[in-house]
Amino acid sequence: MRVGIPTEIKVQEFRVGITPAGVHALKEAGHTVLVQKGAGLGSMITDEEYVAAGAQMVATAKECWDCDMVVKVKEPLAPEYDLFHEGLILYTYLHLAPEPALTKALLEKKVIGIAYETVQFDNGFLPLLAPMSEVAGRMATQVGAQMLTKIEGGMGLLMGGTAGVQAAHVVILGAGTVGLSAAKVAMGMGARVTILDSNLFRLRQIDDLFGGRIQTLASNAFNIAAATKDADLLVGSVLIPGALTPKLVTEAMVKTMKPGSAIVDVAIDQGGCIEPTAKHGATYHDKPTFKYPVNGGEVVCYSVGNMPGAVARTSTFTLTNATMPYMVDLANKGWKKACQDDKALARGINTYDGKVYFKGVSDALGYELHCTCDILK
């Protein structure tokens, strides 16, 4: 199989879809790997390293997109839609629920869209989303701490406080991988932490893990409103795999926040879980924040849709450690046999032959839902 690795074109996206180790694994299995020149530079991977691993370096993205399978990090953007072709296996984060134009293009070109974020084990674990969720969660607290400084428009709080001065209060919506990672960093910085989730079993796990040092609350409108009002930093980390994120924090709730407090909406790539950030839309690393007016001042809001791209080298190697085994399987067996042999990978199928195969996308965009059982017989 011919596997193409184009350069990511999203604004300030520095990750790349494959490492030299991935190239080597595909090459050893008898496949051809085409990497666009310079694709790895944002992750500090040189063209020479790819060549040494067995890749062919090509000048244009089109040469990569003309392959049997394209491996990326972020969802394709409009300039790439014309490069789709029927039967192409596209293996990347897709986040289709809030992307009607991309979904339409994939269906029209009959692309086999396998989304990292919906590959799922029977127990609900998301093996290809978890690596970047861990990075984004850790970043959320670091970014939030900076936003609370006066020079960034915050109220001038030090996350951990000092002797005799109260620490900042970090409120985290969602106790999944993002939320847990954000909580670990916040606790390490000395903050007071509250985490909300609808899964009481998960909250018990969090309580045990941190020895009761984190306040855990059942996620309901009353508790969310109260916690939001008291938050110095609000982190949105709610996830329904592959579906639009529910807007759990309303504009009215945000209006009760203290002037100079901060919001980080990690869920923005699935539509956002906090109304002001969801309405504003994704921001970019070169201008990551915007101000939202509240009584007597403003809240600093951060809604970058590709947070891990800022720490590209860590993110690229973390992600490809997880994606590589499935990538090699797809190349060795073909997409259909690979998905027949692995139920988790089969759940990653979002589009095939002009049809939608993932419920979250179907529900969000109004397409008829088809069952992978019909194509994986």
UniProtKB/Swiss-Prot annotation:
Gene3D superfamilies tied to this protein: NAD(P)-binding Rossmann-like Domain
SUPFAM superfamilies referenced in this protein's UniProt entry, alphabetically: Formate/glycerate dehydrogenase catalytic domain-like, NAD(P)-binding Rossmann-fold domains
Pfam families with a match to the protein in the record: AlaDh_PNT_C (PF01262), AlaDh_PNT_N (PF05222)
pH dependence of function: Optimum pH is 9.0 for reductive amination of pyruvate and pH 9.0-11.5 for oxidative deamination of alanine.
GO CC, one annotated term: plasma membrane
GO molecular function: alanine dehydrogenase activity; nucleotide binding
Positions of substrate binding: R15, K74
Swiss-Prot/TrEMBL catalytic activity: L-alanine + NAD(+) + H2O = pyruvate + NH4(+) + NADH + H(+)
CDD domains: L-AlaDH (cd05305)
Pathway participation: Organosulfur degradation; alkanesulfonate degradation
The keyword Oxidoreductase is annotated on this UniProt entry: yes
Record-listed NAD(+) binding positions: S133, D197, R202, S219, V238, L239, V266, A267, I268, D269, V304, G305, N306, M307
Thermal dependence summary for this entry: Optimum temperature is 55-60 degrees Celsius for reductive amination and 50-55 degrees Celsius for oxidative deamination. But at 60 degrees Celsius an inactivation of the enzyme is observed after about 1 minute, while at 65 degrees Celsius the enzyme is inactive after about 10 seconds.
E.C. numbers: 1.4.1.1
Active site: H95 (proton donor/acceptor), D269 (proton donor/acceptor)
Note: Taurine is an abundant dietary and host-derived molecule whose metabolism to hydrogen sulfide (H2S) by members of the human gut microbiota has many prominent connections to host health and disease. The human gut bacterium and opportunistic pathogen Bilophila wadsworthia produces H2S when respiring sulfite (HSO3-) released from organosulfonate substrates such as taurine and isethionate.
Subunit structure of this chain's protein: Homohexamer.
Annotated function: Involved in an anaerobic respiration pathway that converts the sulfonate taurine (2-aminoethanesulfonate) to ammonia, acetate and sulfide. Catalyzes the oxidative deamination of alanine which regenerates pyruvate, the amino group acceptor for the taurine--pyruvate aminotransferase enzyme, and liberates ammonia. Can also catalyze the reverse reaction in vitro. Cannot use NADP(H)(+) as a substrate. To a lesser extent, is also able to deaminate L-2-aminobutyrate in vitro, and in the amination reaction the enzyme can utilize oxaloacetate and 2-oxobutyrate in addition to pyruvate.
Entry similarity comment: Belongs to the AlaDH/PNT family.
Stated name of the protein: Alanine dehydrogenase
Species of provenance: Bilophila wadsworthia
